Each structure stands twice: as C-alpha cells, then as structure tokens.
C-alpha cells in the first residue's frame, strides 16, 4: 500500500469517528447515532437504506374516494318550486361557468352532472351533453407534438370526455356536428375522445334500424295506451283486434264503486277465435302468468289463455295437394354429385306448445281481475262458456301465489284430555258393535 492511500484511509476514518464523537458530546444516546461509514471504506448499500431500520414505520392512511365538492352539490339543490327539469339543470351548469371563470374543478363538476342527469330527466337530451362538453377549457388539452399524441395527454380530462360519450352511447344519443366541433377544440383530432366519437358515428348509423320491431323513443304514460302498444308488439297477426275490457278508475272519483279497479286490455286474432271455437269442451284451458315484457325502461306484465297440446293420435294432419306443396315441388332434381354421407339438414330443436287463444294485460294479477277478462271474452267467443277455465297464477317475482284453501288458517288442535276421551269412546263403541 502506498503512502498516499494510507493517508486517505486515515483521513476518512478520522472523519467518521469525529462525527460519532460530536453527536455523543451533545447529549444524544449512542444507540440513536446513525451509522456513518468512512468515505474511503467500502460498505453495502443496506447500511444507507432507511427502510432497513428495525423501527417499524407507521402505516399509510387509506386513500378515500374522491367526492364532489360541497359547492358543486349546492348547485344541484332543488329550487324553491322543487321541480327537477331541464331548465333547472341548465341553470346549474350556467351558474358554474359564470361564478367559476377559471373553471377549477370542472372535471368533478362534469362527473357530478352526469350522475344527476337521470334525476332531472335529461339523460337523452343531446343539447345537454354538448353543454357539459362546453365546460372544458378550449385549446388547452390538445397535443402539441408526437409524444403527446402517443401517450395519454392530460389523462384525467380525456377520461372525463370519454365518460360523457359513453353515457350518450348507453342512452342511444347520436352525436352531431356540434359535438364533433367541441371535441376538436378541446382535445384535438388525435385524441381518445375523438376516436370514441368516430366509432360511435360508425356503429350507430349501422345499428339504427337493425330492430325489425322498433319501439318508439317516448313511451306513452297512460297505462291503457302502454298496454295496447305491448300487445301489438307481441301479436304478429296484423288482423288482431285490441279490446279494452275495463278502464282504470281514479281513487278520488266520486262515482267509482270500486276505487281499486284497474285496466284490462286484451288482444285476439280471428284465427285464435276459430281455434277456440273448435276446442273440445272436455279439455280445460288455462290462464297463465304474469309474464314480463320490457319496452325500453318500462316493464309490462301480461297473461295468456292457452290449452295443452293434443296427443299425437288425436291431431288432425292437414293434407296438402301435391301441386300446392312448396316443400316437394313437381320436378325431379337428381343431384349425382352427392353421396350418402352428405347431409344438408340443420339440427333444430323445436319445442311444441299448445295453442294460445288470447293475451291480456291487466293492472292487477289476481284471479278476480282476470275473471272479468274471461267474461269479456265470452261475448265474442260463445264456446268459452262451456269450457272449464283453470287459473295458474304466479307472483311477479317468480313465486307462486297461494290458493284460497292455503290462505285459510287450520282449526286449532283440541286439548290432550279431550283427545283421550274421544279415543276411549270410539273403542267402547267398537267393542259394543
């Protein structure tokens, strides 16, 4: 070892011991002095790592979910009239933009407004969504170079813009030119919200008329009109006739004999009437339900009048003339290229069910209400008066409704002494006989 290396080692050792001695002279205990290795000596990295201390660190406090500011919640408080409509919602958004010029906390406010839209009934209004997008500052979140476009530039703001577009997609709201212009001003063309908009414009136009049985956007509020729409939606026969057997009566109506009287609306086609007239009176028919039918966000419950399937030996097979048979036309087609292993038939599992004679939508699902429907059907179907009708009713939640015999409470059991006396009397009578 040269003399220069020896001098450097001695100087480093003196500095390390000098630091320890100086802290000891100030009154600190020796156990609390941090270990300081000489600068010239080699030591492991664990000696300098603060995590290797034997003293446990306090646990980090759990992160709480981010909540909207109380100031934003006050903007959506109901007005003096208490009405939650589009005017009050737009007023709350305008108050935020007027009193918050720098638009601090605009992301939290937009998330809060998206949650409040269903309460105010504006979740399907395109102008309200454009009003929320207009809250974003313009020309601030646009990418300035290629790296901003590759990586998620201003991720929280872009995720908020995507959330607005996703809620529009969930409610079937088609963006327009104003929506596209706002996104170009806010995030630019090469951004994720703009990519979401392009995808929505592509698929919305293709799936707009994909449903062969479309449902109107605004459903009627009247239960009778809603029931008629549901029945027309279920019945494929255009010649079927919708009949209102009973109109609902208001509870405050003075002329109402029964204030709980509900609506009864039914539908039946001429083919169903002829099938019911040919039905065997010895076989009962059944009233089953309620079954659910969803029309957008409204659920309608309906009942059916049906019969069991006839056994195979009693079915009447309708003979079709050979020249009318479309399945086996009068021509000979010999396919010589086919072999015995070629099978062009599809395996279709068809479940045969009994005939359905009528469908009904009623406000109540009890037997008394449905009996009025059967009485109304007897006016146009006289054969129904001779056919026994059995009610198979179940609850709306899938639970079976108890019958009238199950609702009656069983008689209380007799006392024990009385049972023994009755048994002894029966034995004496049997012995005398």
UniProtKB/Swiss-Prot annotation:
Query: Would the keyword Ribosomal protein be found if you checked this record's keyword annotation?
Result: no
Q: Which domain of life is it from?
A: Eukaryota
- Alphabetized InterPro entries for the sequence: ECIST_C, ECSIT, ECSIT_N
One example of the protein's molecular function in GO is: molecular adaptor activity
The region called Disordered is annotated at: 36-63, 397-433
> Glycyl lysine isopeptide (Lys-Gly) (interchain with G-Cter in ubiquitin) cross-link position in this chain?
372
Annotated localization: Cytoplasm; Nucleus; Mitochondrion
Q: Name one GO biological process term.
A: cell surface receptor protein serine/threonine kinase signaling pathway
Cite the residue span of the transit peptide: 1-48
Post-translational modification (record): Ubiquitinated on Lys-372; leading to translocation in the nucleus together with RELA and NFKB1 and expression of NF-kappa-B-dependent genes.
Gene Ontology cellular component terms for the protein in this record: cytoplasm; cytosol; mitochondrion; nucleoplasm; nucleus
Keywords in alphabetical order: Cytoplasm, Immunity, Innate immunity, Isopeptide bond, Mitochondrion, Nucleus, Transit peptide, Ubl conjugation
Q: What does this protein do?
A: Adapter protein that plays a role in different signaling pathways including TLRs and IL-1 pathways or innate antiviral induction signaling. Plays a role in the activation of NF-kappa-B by forming a signal complex with TRAF6 and TAK1/MAP3K7 to activate TAK1/MAP3K7 leading to activation of IKKs. Once ubiquitinated, interacts with the dissociated RELA and NFKB1 proteins and translocates to the nucleus where it induces NF-kappa-B-dependent gene expression. As part of the MCIA complex, involved in the assembly of the mitochondrial complex I.
Q: Which family does it belong to?
A: Belongs to the ECSIT family.
Give the record's subunit note: Interacts with MAP3K1, SMAD4 and TRAF6. Interacts with SMAD1 only after BMP4-treatment. Part of the mitochondrial complex I assembly/MCIA complex that comprises at least the core subunits TMEM126B, NDUFAF1, ECSIT and ACAD9 and complement subunits such as COA1 and TMEM186. Interacts with NDUFAF1. Interacts with ACAD9. Interacts with TRIM59. Interacts with TMEM70 and TMEM242. Interacts (when ubiquitinated) with NF-kappa-B subunits RELA and NFKB1. Interacts with RIGI, IFIT1 and MAVS; these interactions promote RLR-mediated type I IFN induction.
What is the recorded name of this protein? Evolutionarily conserved signaling intermediate in Toll pathway, mitochondrial
